[in-house]
Amino acid sequence: MERNVTLDFVRGVAILGILLLNISAFGLPKAAYLNPAWYGAITPRDAWTWAFLDLIGQVKFLTLFALLFGAGLQMLLPRGRRWIQSRLTLLVLLGFIHGLLFWDGDILLAYGLVGLICWRLVRDAPSVKSLFNTGVMLYLVGLGVLLLLGLISDSQTSRAWTPDASAILYEKYWKLHGGVEAISNRADGVGNSLLALGAQYGWQLAGMMLIGAALMRSGWLKGQFSLRHYRRTGFVLVAIGVTINLPAIALQWQLDWAYRWCAFLLQMPRELSAPFQAIGYASLFYGFWPQLSRFKLVLAIACVGRMALTNYLLQTLICTTLFYHLGLFMHFDRLELLAFVIPVWLANILFSVIWLRYFRQGPVEWLWRQLTLRAAGPAISKTSR
């Protein structure tokens, strides 16, 4: 099958974009990921950095990646049930190992588990319309659960939202020293992530996967629509997303990031805007692809997308080495941490370009495929039930 270079580029953008938000999760305590006032006070530049990243990136790149993951499920259907289930089960295992032994911000476990459910929904959907509508419904269910959690939550702040000094020191201790203590805390994090996945986030993740599968089945993610359609759709969707999200960002600032409002209720506009912006970003890339494809950097980012799993794990390897093993954790604020993003991006891009000069797949992708072959046997041409 001939590769869709535009799709690879969009996937590469998603992987690189995720690091814009993850860098604060590597370099700061967990509470800082959503709460810029996690330590009780906040500088103007920290607030503006948070606001900018929240507007353009928070949730958007993860949503874009979920969309493409769903598109991948649609593309895998001809390989058959055993192949798909083996592939996703191996991803679950890899995500569990990654989350337990390396980093507490893993997304692979969640994607693998939800994918094991969603691929059947994709297979059994009778039409593009039903697949898309089911995805929208599941996503809205997730938003409804988030609203319910906000309504029943206590107005008093949580230690997870604004940790005290002892909690921050303890997190710094186990992240820098590693060992059994770190594994124990990461195991707790995996458990909490699974609870959140089952209760709320899994609905949204499943919804975006089904929407991505619908867009692939319709030909939209294959680039089969006009450039004018992609451009108009992209500008409109991004504008809608920004319009939804911007007032919520301003309101969180006005409320001084109060727990009940900002941890739950005002997350909803961000979550609602994310699909609009994510699909809008993808649409603009497709719409301007004739111009974008002239640049060598764009084709290099497409190489990152071809090795998405390898590059996601490479980001973990580089950032955990810098912030945990070399002791840079909590040495930089949110804006300063962005200075680390570009060197990591360059590492992703250079490694991908050089590797793909000699090999067809990334190293982790190759291993994943070989293990899938051993577990499932050769892929078959018709999806078995």
Curated annotation (Swiss-Prot):
Single GO cellular component term: plasma membrane
Entry keyword annotation includes Phosphoprotein: no
Keywords on record: Cell membrane, Membrane, Transmembrane, Transmembrane helix, Transport
Membrane topology: Multi-pass membrane protein
Transmembrane feature ranges: 12-32, 50-70, 90-110, 132-152, 195-215, 233-253, 272-292, 312-332, 335-355
Lineage: superkingdom: Bacteria
Classification via InterPro entries: Bact_Transport_Assoc (IPR052529), DUF418 (IPR007349)
Location within or outside the cell: Cell membrane
Pfam families linked to this entry: DUF418
Similarity comment: To B.subtilis YxaH and YrkO.
Function of the molecule: Involved in transport.
Name by which UniProt lists this protein: Uncharacterized protein YeiB
Lineage: Bacteria, Pseudomonadati, Pseudomonadota, Gammaproteobacteria, Enterobacterales
Record gene name: yeiB
